[in-house]
From Swiss-Prot:
InterPro entries, per database record: Ribosomal_uL11, Ribosomal_uL11_bac-typ, Ribosomal_uL11_C, Ribosomal_uL11_C_sf, Ribosomal_uL11_N, Ribosomal_uL11_N_sf
Lineage of the organism: Eukaryota, Fungi, Dikarya, Ascomycota, Pezizomycotina
One Pfam family hit: Ribosomal_L11
Gene Ontology terms describing biological process: translation
GO CC annotation terms, alphabetical: mitochondrial large ribosomal subunit
Name this protein carries in UniProt: Large ribosomal subunit protein uL11m
Length: 158
């Protein structure tokens, strides 16, 4: 009896979502255990990921979707950093206790930084380079970035 007939994950592709610093993938947690449990050699992933993200500033948190096939081969898509991370860095928001930049506690009343429309446009261009967002108009992406900025306490100035 095959694994699929027994109810195992025999013929199904599995997806693992990770956030890894650009150029900083290593077999240690969180990468190693997440991929090891699916039967993937984490060192192979780390070498390929670090090669693909070599042109990006080291440490930039990159969302990754790893698709694991039933034969234990894999492929992965590296996505653009989260919009909030890009905005907080552009606004040079203060660094919180955990060593990460943090948005406002009360976004309507508190402001942690400001960005210009040029920053918004550049962030929208970065996001548009992602395959799933490539069909959206740049104006719509700019509006989404502006709304995201307001929701984390960043003012947008013309």
């Amino acid at each position: 009896m095959s694994k699929a007939a027994k109810g195992g994950a025999g013929g199904v592709e599995q997806v693992v979502k990770l956030i890894v610093g650009a150029g900083q993938a290593s077999p240690s947690p969180p990468v190693g255990p997440a991929l090891g449990s699916k039967g993937i050699k984490s060192m192979d992933f780390c070498k390929e990921f670090n090669a693909r993200t070599a042109h990006i500033n080291t440490g930039t948190p990159m969302p990754v979707r790893v698709t694991v096939r039933p034969d234990r081969s894999f492929h992965f898509d590296v996505r653009t950093p989260h919009t909030s991370w890009l905005l907080l860095n552009a606004a040079e928001a203060p660094i919180g206790k955990g060593g990460k930049r943090k948005g406002a506690s009360n976004p309507g009343k508190e402001v942690v930084g400001t960005v210009s429309l040029k920053h918004v446009y550049e962030i929208a261009k970065i996001k548009q380079s992602e395959l799933r967002l490539s069909g959206l108009p740049l104006e719509g992406l700019c509006r989404a970035v502006i709304y995201q900025a307001r929701s984390i306490g960043i003012n947008v100035i013309p």
